[in-house]
């Protein structure tokens, strides 16, 4: 996939941010796995990330964790972090997140989906609309954290892909945020129940500001 790499020098701030995210990689993957209902302990998750397997964990859960690792490693690459946080980037992240589960996990959803625990049924996404909307969000005159949150929540609510939308949306938002040298965004284990509740409310029409304030306060780590 030609993602339009440019070889320009990264600022010291962005290089520090890459190190900061790498130093927290295992914890971030663990937190994302918790949000997905993957029942591994932190030591098991660490083991999977380091060795690719662990006794007593289902193949599905191992694959999900390895996919998260690959998607994070992808965005933390020095070339990739210089690429635009656009629709093509989102699709590539989704492809990595869905690897081994769907043949075309990075392709826009062409089938209806239902989301458990909510009456909200996302309409079928239209590629040109998603491309345009992501560009619009990104070009707003707002703080990077506000833009990252909006990118994340727009992609989740749109359910751009057949599966892996929460995982892909969070990693995509981090691609944008880290490229701005503004920390990272992950829902910590202890904030997951509250996040799920706010997510349903957001899907059902609650304004973005509500879950946005929660994400900014509880899920944003800066340095």
Please annotate each region the language model reported:
Residues 1-223:
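FIC/Doc superfamily catalytic core
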């Amino acid at each position: 996939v030609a993602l339009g790499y440019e070889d320009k020098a990264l600022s010291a701030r962005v290089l520090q941010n890459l190190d900061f995210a790498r130093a927290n990689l295992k914890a971030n993957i663990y937190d994302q796995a918790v949000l997905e209902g993957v029942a591994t302990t932190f030591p098991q998750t660490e083991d999977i990330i380091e060795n690719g397997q662990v006794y007593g964990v289902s193949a599905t859960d191992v694959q999900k964790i390895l996919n998260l690792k690959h998607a994070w490693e992808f965005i933390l690459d020095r070339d990739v972090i210089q690429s635009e946080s656009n629709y093509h980037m989102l699709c590539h992240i989704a492809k990595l997140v869905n690897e081994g589960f769907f043949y075309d996990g990075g392709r826009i959803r062409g089938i209806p989906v239902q989301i458990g625990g909510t009456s909200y049924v996302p309409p079928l996404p239209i590629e040109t609309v998603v491309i345009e909307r992501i560009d619009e969000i990104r070009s707003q005159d707002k703080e990077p954290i506000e833009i990252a949150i909006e990118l994340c929540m727009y992609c989740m609510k749109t359910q751009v892909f057949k599966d892996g939308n929460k995982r892909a949306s969070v990693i995509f938002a981090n691609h944008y945020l880290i490229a701005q040298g503004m920390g990272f965004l992950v829902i910590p284990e202890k904030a997951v129940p509250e996040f799920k509740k706010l997510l349903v409310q957001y899907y059902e029409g609650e304004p973005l500001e509500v879950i946005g304030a929660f994400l900014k306060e509880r899920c944003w780590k800066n340095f």
